[in-house]
């Protein structure tokens, strides 16, 4: 007999859709004892949230998140709201005994994150943060190769996440669609939005980051705010680049911008070790590029592993070898790991929880502090 986990989703935008798709797909492709049930969705616009509930198969809807988290027929709450509300909603969920699945980043800053971690760990409630890219098969394969020690000593890690959607000066800030440009709602710009993904993956694969030296730039200093209709200062970072040192002694370069004309979502990382190197590109997400210095010189060169075989992480749960997976599958994979953990609570967690996400938040905080001070900044331990 399957054990139902009744989900309450708060927010029905881009992430609300991706998470809802994962809830709908999980039981078709992964055999877990606990299964999600789409119980309720919450949004402020009654007409829109009702339509979303009907389209995605939620049994009911609310227009006030406070009412949703108090409902006795909700077991777990999925927070898909702007960053400034994560902490408040999560703390209310904990008071009401709800499991939490929270969008990234964990909070606006480390101080908020600490409060969330302290409360959720005291409660013992299962908790997850949606850092999804690590659950793409090729990325998980990279982690497995590094963990097996195949690279030897790691020397370098580099990552970038490039977009171009905010170049126009006519683009306003704030509101439902553009809250990422409003510091009050987002906390930061590309650092918390895009680099947080790069940092999470890097820490997962290569260990903790101990210090950073960063620079940021806001290219357009003022934008019309949708709430007031008047021009206001833009205080988020449009671009950020930083150097980093890992605990294992390796060096790193990270870069992110929303001003790289021609790039819609270019996320790449590369790891260089004494024996092997690995590289990955979101645009070719099913492939992991692999260089092995140990093969004979006349056979040496970069090769591509098509991570769609049944032996590759997660791929065997889907189609036959050679058929590709996409961005949306990463959310189903993360959800599968969460539900496997509910099935076996004593097993090692294979997904990012609040404490791991707090470590990423600390790196983001250090990056912003370094950019402001112009100095190297040590990263707080989570």
Spans of features found by a protein language model:
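N-terminal Rossmann-like dinucleotide-binding module
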Residues: 1-56
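Core-facing hydrophobic residues within beta-strands of well-ordered domains
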Residues: 36-38, 74, 154, 209
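C-terminal glycine/acidic-rich active-site capping loop/insertion
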Residues: 211, 221-237, 241, 245-246, ...
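Predominantly a Rossmann-like dinucleotide-binding segment in NAD(P)-dependent oxidoreductases
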Residues: 133-234, 288, 374
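Beta-strand-loop-alpha-helix segment that lines the small-molecule cofactor/substrate pocket
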Residues: 76-134, 149
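Hydrophobic residues in well-ordered beta-strands that form the structural core
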Residues: 62, 102, 127-129, 158, ...
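Glycine-rich phosphate/pyrophosphate-binding beta-alpha loops
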Residues: 196, 255-264, 323
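Short acidic low-complexity segments
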Residues: 31, 60-73
């Amino acid at each position: 007999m399957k054990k139902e986990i009744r989900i309450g989703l708060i927010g029905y935008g881009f992430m609300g859709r991706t998470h809802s798709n994962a809830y709908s797909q999980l039981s078709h492709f992964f055999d877990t004892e606990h299964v999600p049930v789409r119980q309720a969705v919450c949004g402020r616009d009654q007409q829109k949230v009702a339509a979303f509930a009907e389209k995605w198969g939620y049994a009911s809807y609310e227009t006030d998140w406070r009412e949703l988290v108090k409902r006795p027929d909700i077991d777990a709450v999925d927070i898909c709201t702007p960053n400034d509300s994560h902490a408040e909603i999560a703390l209310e969920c904990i008071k009401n005994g709800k499991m939490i699945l929270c969008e990234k980043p964990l909070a606006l800053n480390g101080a908020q994150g600490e409060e969330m971690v302290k409360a959720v760990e005291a409660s013992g409630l299962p908790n997850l943060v949606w850092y999804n890219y690590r659950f793409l098969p090729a990325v998980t394969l990279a982690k497995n190769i590094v963990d097996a020690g195949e690279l030897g000593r790691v020397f370098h890690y580099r990552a970038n996440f490039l977009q171009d959607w905010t170049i126009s000066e006519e683009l306003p800030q704030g509101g439902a669609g553009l809250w990422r440009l409003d510091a009050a709602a987002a906390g930061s710009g590309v650092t918390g939005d895009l680099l947080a993904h790069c940092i999470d993956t890097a820490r997962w694969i290569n260990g903790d980051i101990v210090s950073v030296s960063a620079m940021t730039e806001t290219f357009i200093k003022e934008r019309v705010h949708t709430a007031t209709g008047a021009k206001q200062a833009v205080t988020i970072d449009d671009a950020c680049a930083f150097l980093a040192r890992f605990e294992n002694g390796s060096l790193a370069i990270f870069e992110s911008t929303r001003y790289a004309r021609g790039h819609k979502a270019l996320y790449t990382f590369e790891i260089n070790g004494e024996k092997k190197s690995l590289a990955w590109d979101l645009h070719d997400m099913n492939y992991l590029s692999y260089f092995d210095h140990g093969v004979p010189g006349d056979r040496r060169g970069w090769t591509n592993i098509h991570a769609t075989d049944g032996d590759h992480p997660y791929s065997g749960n889907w189609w036959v070898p050679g058929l590709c997976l996409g961005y949306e599958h990463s959310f189903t994979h993360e959800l599968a790991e969460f539900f496997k953990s509910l099935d076996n609570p004593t097993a090692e967690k294979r997904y990012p929880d609040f404490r791991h996400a707090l470590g990423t938040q600390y790196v983001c905080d250090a990056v912003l502090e370094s950019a402001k001070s112009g100095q190297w900044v040590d990263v707080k331990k989570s």
